[in-house]
UniProtKB/Swiss-Prot annotation:
Gene3D superfamilies: Vaccinia Virus protein VP39. Catalyzes the conversion of S-adenosyl-L-methionine (SAM) to carboxy-S-adenosyl-L-methionine (Cx-SAM). Homodimer. It catalyses: prephenate + S-adenosyl-L-methionine = carboxy-S-adenosyl-L-methionine + 3-phenylpyruvate + H2O. It comes from the Bacteria. This is Carboxy-S-adenosyl-L-methionine synthase. SUPFAM superfamilies: S-adenosyl-L-methionine-dependent methyltransferases (SSF53335). It comes from Haemophilus influenzae (strain PittGG). The keyword S-adenosyl-L-methionine applies.
């Protein structure tokens, strides 16, 4: 695993964070050291796939990055005629994802596409994964995407939505942000790295509250919506059609 040192030296002109070649190269290390509970979420996606994925259906991993969630789901699917479609708009991520998936043999076909998830049809789905993806979409596009997902899910299908959250109580919000930064420092990131990455993400990652997520998912039509995992200001929800 290549170590993430992208923000370890001062950057004179710090632009917006993008999922380019450099990020794709170090992404597994970056996300493990940056997202509290990430491994637990990936493992549980497999457990949810085992329960929810049905025969003759599709599984979508929207914003699949290097394929961790896709592989976790695939390892735990025991139904016939299932196909997994992973989609990411970063070509470097897609190339590495394809290599990663190909390294593990399975009877379940996986197709990895380089595309904008807003422009991809969702159909005959028993499971859709949005693992730290929605937060990078413009807020005005989120309802349309979730509506498309809901309409493309079969009855009793599940959406797994993992996100970084903001909290309406300012003191709690600041506390959890501080704890997250402490988590990153404990994982070897310097103050400079934490600060520069936060600045780079400011304009591209817009977080919502748990309440906002729940209300939006209910309004789209999901019958059951629940937060099943949280660590500091990161967490994951399930929404069942």
């Amino acid at each position: 695993m290549v170590k993430d040192t992208l923000f370890s030296t001062p950057i004179a002109k710090l632009g917006d964070f993008i999922f380019d070649e450099n990020v794709a190269e170090v992404f597994p290390d970056m996300i493990q050291r940056s997202v509290p509970g990430y491994s637990n979420i990936i493992t549980a996606i497999g457990m949810l796939a085992e329960r929810f994925v049905t025969a003759d259906s599709n599984v979508y991993d929207l914003g699949c990055s290097r394929g961790a969630a896709t592989l976790s789901a695939r390892r735990n699917i025991h139904q016939p005629n299932v196909k997994i479609i992973g989609i990411d708009n970063s070509q470097p991520m897609v190339e590495r994802c394809r290599q990663h998936i190909a390294a593990y043999h399975s009877e379940i076909p996986v197709e990895i596409l380089c595309n904008d998830i807003r422009h991809v049809e969702i159909k005959n789905a028993s499971m859709v994964i949005l693992n730290f993806t929605l937060q990078f979409l413009p807020p005005e596009d989120r309802v349309a995407l979730l509506t498309k997902i809901y309409e493309g899910l079969n009855p009793n299908g599940v959406l797994v939505l993992s996100e970084k959250f903001r909290f309406e109580d300012t003191k709690i919000d600041h506390l959890l942000i501080d704890l997250h930064h402490q988590f990153k420092r404990a994982n070897g990131y310097s103050e400079l790295e934490v600060s520069q990455k936060r600045t780079a993400l400011e304009n591209v990652m817009r977080t919502d509250s748990i309440k906002t997520h729940k209300v939006r998912l209910k309004n789209v039509g999901f019958s059951q919506v629940e937060l099943w995992f949280q660590c500091f200001n990161f967490g994951s929800m399930i929404a069942v059609k």
